[in-house]
Amino acid sequence: MYPSQGVGVIKTIEEKVFKSNKVLYYVIYLEVSDMTIMVPVDKATGLGIRPIVGKDEALKALELISEEYEPIPSDWKLRYQMNMDLLKKGSIMDIAMIVRSLYHRSKVKELPILERKLYDSALKLLEDEISCSLRKSKEEVENLIFTRLETETE
């Protein structure tokens, strides 16, 4: 999982010479953007690249989105920055919190364009990771997510 980019598959590990040093790189294919990237193996963790979560963690993220939550600041710029910080951390629980809070905020008032894009990105990241983790179609996971989101509001 690559924060803010989504689920990727390590295709190979290649050795390249960089500034006269041999460096190992992950060659990662990101399906969502149909893009291949190279990331130095020794910097991958620092960049937030992590394995897909296990089934238990994916189910916890689904549970989180149906739990009660603290209302978020009404100032959208502050909300946006807080959520961007969570997105950069890249944990599935942080992404689930973004989806939950912005979904419920959108029910109160239409989200500003930047926040709407952030919500859409976080939702896609959450769907993709849970889909891979639970081995379910993206459509099934999308239905699960929205069912959970609606459960809390009723």
Predicted feature residues:
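A positional/architectural concept
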Residues: 1-47
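Charge/polar-rich, low-complexity and marginally structured segments
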Residues: 42-154
